[in-house]
Amino acid sequence: MLKIWSMKEKQAAEGGSAKKKVTAAQLRVQKDLSELSLPSTMKTHFPSAEDIMNFELTVRPDEGFYQGGEFRFSFYVNPNFPHEPPKVKCLQKVYHPNIDLEGNVCLNILREDWKPVLSLNAVMIGLQYLFLEPNASDPLNKDAAHQMTANREEFKRNVKHSMAGGSVAGERFDCVLIK
């Protein structure tokens, strides 16, 4: 034990260590990312190679209402991860029952159903599932949810129009079609 302290004192006297301390949250994120098994319809992107706590996910649904679109999400993993879920936001304005106009996402495992045993992979797969099976019973965009349950064909038309950058009910949406 004394030897460790003397080594630390010597290191401090020589200008300290260039190594940054790795937090428990960073270790868990490293583990989750190393175990990712994403389908070909999803891809991660790290704007800063040094910052694994902030990254983006791209989802390209290959079936359902949102087929042909490309949806980008930002992930912010806070220092309390995995005891708190990551913060996830959609970076585009999309017409979706579970995504509001500011990009907030309604996914139960990002709120009350979060458990520390859940991984980033589980969140990413949950996001993909929202595009395959939108959930009108737990909406953030109530207009889209109502349209989906009241008139599915019109909802489908509204989704296609909004994905092309059109307006629905006076609200303009971002073009998310794959180029």
Swiss-Prot record:
UniProt cross-references to InterPro entries, sorted A to Z: Ub_conjugating_enzyme (IPR050113), UBQ-conjugat_E2_core (IPR000608), UBQ-conjugating_AS (IPR023313), UBQ-conjugating_enzyme/RWD (IPR016135)
Alphabetical list of Gene3D superfamilies matching this protein: Ubiquitin Conjugating Enzyme
Active site: C106 (glycyl thioester intermediate)
Pathway: Protein modification; protein neddylation
Cross-referenced PANTHER family: UBIQUITIN-CONJUGATING ENZYME E2 (PTHR24067)
GO cellular component: cytosol; nucleus
Assigned keywords, A-Z: ATP-binding, Nucleotide-binding, Transferase, Ubl conjugation pathway
Similarity comment: Belongs to the ubiquitin-conjugating enzyme family. UBC12 subfamily.
Keyword S-adenosyl-L-methionine included in the entry's annotation: no
Pfam family, any one: UQ_con
GO molecular function: ATP binding; NEDD8 conjugating enzyme activity; NEDD8 transferase activity
Coiled coil location: none
Protein task: Accepts the ubiquitin-like protein NEDD8/RUB1 from the UBA3-ULA1 E1 complex and catalyzes its covalent attachment to other proteins.
Gene that this sequence comes from: UBC12
Any single biological process term in GO: protein neddylation
Highest taxon, organism lineage: Eukaryota
UniProt entry tagged with the keyword Nucleotide-binding: yes
EC code(s) of this entry: 2.3.2.34
Catalytic reactions of this protein: [E1 NEDD8-activating enzyme]-S-[NEDD8 protein]-yl-L-cysteine + [E2 NEDD8-conjugating enzyme]-L-cysteine = [E1 NEDD8-activating enzyme]-L-cysteine + [E2 NEDD8-conjugating enzyme]-S-[NEDD8-protein]-yl-L-cysteine
Domain UBC core: residue ranges: 24-168
Protein name in the entry: NEDD8-conjugating enzyme UBC12
Cystine connections: none
